[in-house]
Regions:
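Residue-level signal for inorganic ion chemistry
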Residues: 10, 46, 68, 90, ...
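Short phosphate-engaging motifs
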Residues: 23, 60, 64, 86, ...
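ALDH superfamily catalytic-core signature
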Residues: 202-332
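Hydrophobic face of alpha-helices
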Residues: 28, 47-54, 65, 87, ...
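N-terminal Rossmann-like NAD(P)+-binding subdomain of aldehyde/semialdehyde dehydrogenases
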Residues: 1-111, 298
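Rossmann-like NAD(P) dinucleotide-binding subdomain of oxidoreductase/dehydrogenase enzymes
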Residues: 102-238
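Structural signal for hydrophobic packing residues in well-ordered secondary-structure cores
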Residues: 35, 39, 54-61, 65, ...
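A conserved hydrophobic position in a structured secondary element of the catalytic/binding core
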Residues: 5, 199, 263
């Protein structure tokens, strides 16, 4: 079952049943037929359809941004920025596709040598919840430009905005959602032509291993523990401001957030108060409120995990210089 939940109230906003495997097989067969017809069209025609999608996405900006805000929990202005970035991405690839995909003649010892770009077929993407519009389009748009069909298995907790996005896509692009449970997602890898995944390292290992067993191409973007490093000659005020932004932007729920802040010992005593002063400026609250700068976490279990990590660190000798307690009020 796919559920979208309001991060402030816990209220279920949208529910969708996972599709049965025979339904997916029929969907995949139809998508393969659509992909063949789509790939036969000139690149400029495929690009025109993507420009149309960009127009629709721009028109739906406010509505989709509010959905992302409610479901994911990020501040509304951050969700609006996600929509703007997504529109720009579509226009970028649609504009450059004829140039990027043009056949190229290259010099070799043969009488004629060319580089030609051919579609793979149907590509499956297993996508995360943190940027439910951007992550899907970042994967799909270049693949569509190249004449592929795209199937997206969304994260269960962003079902509503995913459904709204695919309503905009319509029937002119071979680009659909696959509402699969975990086991059927593994089976889908076997029946599609390539797989893309964004998410945790542990899940990426499992999916990549399954793709490898069936000789399917895979592209992975996996989680990390990025370090923000402050050197002795840094502008400490600027570094403190950027460190706070990098750690707490999108409530810290992004792959490129500063997971660790490493400060040269020579400047640590000076840096820490500057960083704490920046943290003190953060305003927790309703992510729809323009005054809010620190939005809720996405799910209750994620908040519980973060709190447990803080308590474990304190139990092992760490000191909490600010925060350290669960905030009162609604939301996570």
């Amino acid at each position: 079952m796919f559920h979208s939940v309001d991060v402030l109230s816990g209220r279920i906003l949208y529910s969708k049943e996972a599709q049965a495997w025979p339904d997916f097989e029929r969907q995949l067969a139809a998508l393969r037929r659509a992909q063949q017809a789509f790939a036969a069209r000139p690149v400029i025609e495929r690009a025109a359809l993507l420009h149309d999608l960009a127009d629709k996405l721009a028109q739906a900006r406010s509505r989709l941004a509010e959905m992302v805000c409610e479901e994911v929990g990020r501040c509304l202005r951050e969700c609006e920025a996600e929509l703007d970035k997504s529109v720009a991405l579509i226009r970028y690839y649609a504009r450059l596709a004829p140039q990027l995909l043009a056949h190229k003649t290259i010099a070799t010892q043969a009488s004629l040598s060319q580089v030609r770009f051919e579609p793979i077929g149907v590509v499956l993407a297993v996508m995360p919840w943190n940027y439910p519009v951007w992550q899907v389009l970042r994967f799909a748009v270049p693949a569509l430009c190249a004449g592929n069909a795209c199937l997206v298995k969304p994260a269960p907790s962003v079902a509503r905005v995913t459904a709204a996005l695919f309503e905009l896509v319509g029937e002119h692009l071979p680009f659909q959602a696959a509402w699969l449970d975990h086991d059927d997602t593994l089976r889908a890898i076997e029946h599609t032509d390539a797989m893309a995944f964004t998410g945790s390292t542990a899940t990426g290992r499992r999916l990549a291993a399954h793709a490898g067993q069936h000789l399917k191409k895979s592209v992975l973007e996996l989680g990390g523990s990025n370090a923000f490093i402050v050197m002795p000659d840094a502008d400490l005020a600027a570094a403190a401001k950027e460190a706070c932004y990098s750690r707490f932007r999108d409530a810290g729920q992004s792959c490129n957030a500063a997971k660790r802040i490493i400060v040269a010992e020579a400047v640590a005593d000076e840096f820490v108060p500057l960083f704490l002063a920046e943290c003190a400026k953060l305003q927790m609250g309703n992510p729809m409120d323009a005054a809010t700068t620190l939005a809720p976490l996405h799910r209750e279990d994620l908040r519980a995990r973060v709190h447990a990590q803080v308590q474990d660190a304190l139990a092992h000798g760490a000191r909490a210089l600010c925060g350290g307690q669960l905030p009162r009020g609604s939301g996570w």
